[in-house]
Amino acid sequence: MKRLTVIAVIAFSLLTSCKKIEFTNFKSDWDKSPDGTWVGPDCWANRLQDWHIADRHLECLSTKPMRTVHLMTRQISDRRGILNSSVYISVAGENDDSGDAAAGILVGAGKDIDYRSASLVFHSWGKGAGIFIGLDSKGNLFIRDFEREDYFFKYEKKNNIQWTDARLVLNILPKKGTYTIKVLALDPVTNVIIDRTVASGIPSTRIQGNIALVSHAGYKSRNTRFAFTGWSVSGSKVERNTSWNTGPLVTAQYTLSRNILKLTAQLMPVATGDSNDVILQLKENNKWVDADTSQVSRPSYTAQFRINNWDRDINTDYRVCYKISRHSVKTYYLNGTIKHDPVDKDQIKMLSLSCIKQITRPEEGRWSGIDGGEFPFETAVTYPHITLVNNLKKFNPDIVFFAGDQVYEGSSPTAADLDHPYLDYLYKWYLWCITYRDLTTSVPVITIPDDHDVYHGNLWGAGGIATPPGLKGTEAQDAGGYKMPAEFVNMVQTTQTSHLPDPADPAPVGEGITVYFTECNIGGVSIAVIEDRKFKSAPKSLFPRADIVNGWPHNRNWNVRYNSRIGNAYLLGNRQIKFLEEWSGDWSRQTWMKAVVSQTLFANLATIPRDSLDDDAVPLMEIPDSGSYVEGDRLATDFDSDGWPQNGRDRALRIFRKAFAIHIAGDQHLGSTVQYGIDQFRDAGFAIVSPATGNLWPRHWFPPYNGTNRKPEWPGNYGDFEDGFGNKMTVFAVANPHKINIKPVLQNELSTGFSTIIFNRQTRDIELSNWPYYADPEKDKPFPFWPVRINQLDNYNRTPVGWLPEIRVEGMVNPVIKIIRETTGEIIYSLRIKGNTFQPRVFETGYYTIEIGEPDQNKWQKIEKVYPTTFIERQPLDISF
């Protein structure tokens, strides 16, 4: 027996030595790694919480099926050649006597897709899942076609050996246009062969793509786990992938506002035995210079940097540096560019995205994740959204806004793991980080979390309280507050918002949850960042007769429009209202335009089937043909929307319009542009809602009656409407889901996409567009009826009762003008005008004070006791500085 073993090992050694390309070889270093969650710079673990390094081994912690660790720095190429791999395997959990558990190597995963997409191959079989070559718990080798449910190229169940340690040796070599797979399983101490097998005639297209380790607990026992060490990959078919080169550094986000740079680097969950120091370096005179040092913050695994008095006039290259020690000390770098503040540009371009899913439906009518059964990896994994990101970069944005749901706790790509929520969040957050890394490392970014980011379906934060103990699911959500601990919520906010300018009022809320509402100034566009979930009241306890379930009133006899309008419900809360009041009148730092960003629209722009009590039917609704109209819908009354509370909504919109500010949001999945109405239609500002980037909840807008005051070319669902809560809104454009033949069809037919907002410094015009997910700006167009072009002044479109004199200014360019009602002292509105003339309009009779000046120079003139007239032509006011 030993002689046969020696001959077999020699034969395999000869095969593995043929035509080696040394620089492509891989050898794991887990034997040199400190204990911890992170599996190392070369690999991606599915899932993050399912693996760790312990006692010099890579150990699987999960007893779920088909846990994988993909090798990201090497791939199996499509060229003809040899592939060799070997690994030492140990049983880490209970020994399985059913033969259902197995461990081994997955080859050819995601052969026709990007290696990052392929790295999500785990748990389920399906198209693109590769070939699983492994050793079952009874000592039988197999070669399984993991693209099919239960098909094996080779599997002879002849052994019944309760092994605890084995060495798996794999050799794949070409033969007459196909490939032959040879596998040995050896006792690592005695070199006795446990089993051997060969499969020939494997199609060459199956031996390309990713390679990964597999710990498979099986579907029967579910108690067996495996550990690995000494993994090697080599051969002429292996190619090095240099794009996965940041190691522990995942991404960075930054803002540069009012000469303050704030940058947050996101790290993998590095071990406590690794370094705690992260360094930010800047390129000065063609040399890298240390600019700041930060410590790894846990459990967010972030490093936060701040530099005051930043030179905003130049582009500056930077890199984040982090050292780890394995065989030797190696420094990893994450590179990016701090763009200069675009005060010199006539157009400030903003991108807005929200609600990203890393997968789409596996098939029509099925909305499960990767862990929901058969999964077509080659068509249903949208991560890392390569075409989308490449097209986004073509816009050359000055600022990018991510409006929330960067993470979906369920089915993106897997169901929520509430036993390990911190690592489950990071696992899904890292997918977002990697997707947008090319943007976020080199463009200022505003990122804010929404309900799904903090593991809620809907969220009424109620001032940051905890949900009542003992409640779960929608019952907990309806009660108000946060289901997850404050530490978890703060971790999420740290990963997503710690690079934002300092909060306007930093005091924590409720259970110690931090806040992030603030102002960010980019090129003179002042952006108010607000939180429209954290302070919002929960409706269920306020309306006991409504029978509210997950934010939807189930009592059909309860009149939502009239009964839901009360004065003791909050939307933004008093602290944010105070901030917005102060922000609306602050035009310093040459601010010439204002915008508000938040999670969701301040209206309920959606319809549902007439007989439905809530939106549970939305994922099941048939996607209509393009141009067709869905009949039989009613207006939605979703308390999760910011159509409620109406008083809080109106209060906020009155402040927005005082600053002539546009509103930019996400959340609803339904791309739209509306103009708000408060007392009358179209008397407040415009809003644009981005389509979902990845949509599993395709809301639509098919009201049961036509809108009024429509343009001739507008369809019936455009124009003036009151939503289900009685809020006035005018629909200018909406992107309903519709049938389409552009691949991936199951993604694009849901009208997924993104928004662009272009602010014009010279004209003060604003161009709003919603684009399809697949759109290339160099050859494609936005969705129909976009772009919508407005002027800054259109955001305060009340009908005036009178006019103040025209103001003509000399000695000052583009001054700021404030109109103050003397009886109340309230600033009616303020703005930085373009040029030197402006005629104010007012909306009530009485005396007004006009202030004209430049806040950056603290030069002001005031004219009091100015009374409006009903005619425009009157003696102008000449102001000289």
What are these regions (language model features)?
Residues 20-47:
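Extracellular carbohydrate-recognition regions
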Residues 49-68:
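Short carbohydrate-recognition loop motifs
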Residues 56, 220-238, 258, 267, ...:
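Long, structured stretches of catalytic cores involved in phosphate-ester chemistry, encompassing
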Residues 141-169:
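Short, aromatic/His-centered strand-loop micro-motif at the edge of beta-sheets
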Residues 1-21:
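Bacterial Sec-dependent N-terminal signal peptides
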Residues 192-226:
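Flexible glycan-contacting loops in extracellular carbohydrate-active proteins
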